[in-house]
Amino acid sequence: MKLHFYKYQATGNDFVLIDNRLGQYSFSVDQIKKICDRKFGIGADGIMLIEKHPTLDFNLVYYNSDGSQSLCGNGSRAAMHFASFLGMVNGRATFNAYDGKHDAELLSGDIVRLKMNDTKEMAVIGNDLRINTGSPHLICFVKSVHAYPVVPEGKRIRYSEPYKEKGINVNFVELLPDNTIFVRTYERGVEDETLSCGTGVTAAALAVSQRGYTSPVSIKTLGGELSVEFKSVPQQDGQGQSVLPTGQAGTFQDIFLVGPAKMVFEGDLEL
């Protein structure tokens, strides 16, 4: 089978995008692994298929490089750029992804603004925070993120209890001045550090709101810079007083992930 593909990167998070509007492609886990293999395939953190949807602008099917599925924030931004390239949308889109419906907007240049779904719980686990932004994330605060052993520590946590069975993405976050943070992420499904993780930086931005950071939070990653906008909605008791229940830190809505997405090249692969 000959596969025509487009290679994208979104702040260093790289993907193989496939126009599947005719529904001619479906892949086994072994084929997904081969396509994403950096020695024997195209090489990517994940694969995305853009498909028709009966009521929305398009349907996005995302696979991590190990064949598992999840929401990918950076991938969704790349998908919006790709859908615009294909002429499916004109600047704005509403599409279906792994965790439901999303809105996206192609701004000036290659900047894409993606609306994330609301979050409803942030669990406090010792000094860390756990939050689901379409994929589950653990936020660990460190002092020198550049020198931190992200891969061995991230792998250890990801395969430890209670995360061993389903896995978790582990984000190491350094607080910087000027409402800015630096984030490095060990991603489940890729089972390695990626240069950037969209759902991870979103989770990190929401987490640092508990430490006085305000929207929009600027995020630095090894692959580039992004920003996250959000509104915090405190939990309330029966008298309308704001409270933070044990293990929760409020809810967030109107969450937007903003950053670049670029096509790198296109080609054909014989599977």
Model-found features: residue ranges?
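Active-site glycine-rich loop that binds ribose-phosphate moieties when present
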Residues: 114-127, 152-157
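Extracellular structured ligand-interaction cores
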Residues: 111
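A glycine-rich beta-to-alpha transition motif near the start of alpha/beta enzyme domains, typified by
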Residues: 1-108, 139-242, 247-271
